[in-house]
């Protein structure tokens, strides 16, 4: 494979999905074709699994079921969309990938990092991003954003207790510290304009020959 894989990570409320939408016009100027996508989802069956995972009515889904649903969606997405694009030399930029499972299920759900790492490896055959942008934000600020900006469309994970969201953020910070060569941390508490500018600066510096 000679493509480039970039992932965007962060707690709910960090604004990474909005940032991706904002940077797309600029990164689509890269010399290679850019393929934006998301997890869970990205392909038909994985999008259907996404609806099951996030539906607030599905309260019977326990932590282990949730983890395996994410892994199944990830496998489908990788096989059908990500790998073909990477093999064709394209730039794949994905909103959430393997680190979300480690942060949310490994730390947030207390399933353990080793278990989640193993399942991630099994589902992806060891595929890892070339670069991961981690959008960091205080948990209380993030939850306030969720209630303010997404009050009409909160999902099952949004409704979790604040303590779970704090564990997720703490987990992310530990993950970032373990792989400083892969991660770049961006302060997501800034204005959207500043976060977008910081994100583009990182991408253009890291992949200077691609622009």
From Swiss-Prot:
The lineage of its organism: Bacteria, Bacillati, Bacillota, Bacilli, Lactobacillales. It comes from Lactococcus lactis subsp. cremoris (strain MG1363). GO terms for molecular function: ATP binding; dTMP kinase activity. Pfam families: Thymidylate_kin. GO terms for biological process: dTDP biosynthetic process; dTTP biosynthetic process; dUDP biosynthetic process. GO terms for cellular component: cytosol. Phosphorylation of dTMP to form dTDP in both de novo and salvage pathways of dTTP synthesis. HAMAP family: Thymidylate_kinase (MF_00165). Belongs to the thymidylate kinase family. Keywords: ATP-binding, Kinase, Nucleotide biosynthesis, Nucleotide-binding, Transferase. This is Thymidylate kinase. It comes from the Bacteria. Its EC number is 2.7.4.9. It catalyses: dTMP + ATP = dTDP + ADP. The keyword Protein biosynthesis does not apply. The keyword Cytoplasm does not apply. Gene3D superfamilies: P-loop containing nucleotide triphosphate hydrolases. NCBIfam families: DTMP_kinase (TIGR00041).
């Amino acid at each position: 494979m000679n493509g480039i894989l970039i992932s965007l990570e962060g707690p709910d409320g960090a604004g990474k999905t909005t940032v991706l939408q904002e940077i797309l016009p600029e990164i689509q100027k890269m010399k290679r074709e850019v393929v934006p996508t998301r997890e869970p989802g990205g392909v038909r069956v994985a999008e259907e699994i996404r609806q099951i995972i996030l539906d607030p009515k599905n309260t019977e889904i326990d932590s282990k079921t949730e983890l395996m649903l994410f892994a199944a969606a990830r496998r489908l997405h990788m096989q059908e969309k990500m790998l073909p694009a990477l093999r064709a030399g394209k730039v794949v930029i994905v909103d959430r990938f393997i680190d979300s499972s480690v942060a949310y299920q490994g730390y947030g759900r207390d399933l353990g990092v080793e278990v989640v790492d193993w399942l991630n490896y099994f589902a992806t055959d060891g595929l890892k991003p070339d670069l991961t942008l981690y959008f960091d934000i205080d948990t209380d600020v993030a939850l306030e954003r969720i209630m303010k900006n997404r009050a009409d469309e909160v999902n099952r994970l949004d409704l979790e207790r604040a303590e779970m969201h704090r564990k997720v953020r703490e987990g992310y910070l530990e993950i970032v510290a373990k792989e400083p060569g892969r991660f770049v941390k961006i302060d997501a508490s800034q204005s959207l304009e500043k976060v977008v500018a910081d994100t583009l600066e990182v991408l253009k510096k890291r992949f200077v020959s691609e622009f």
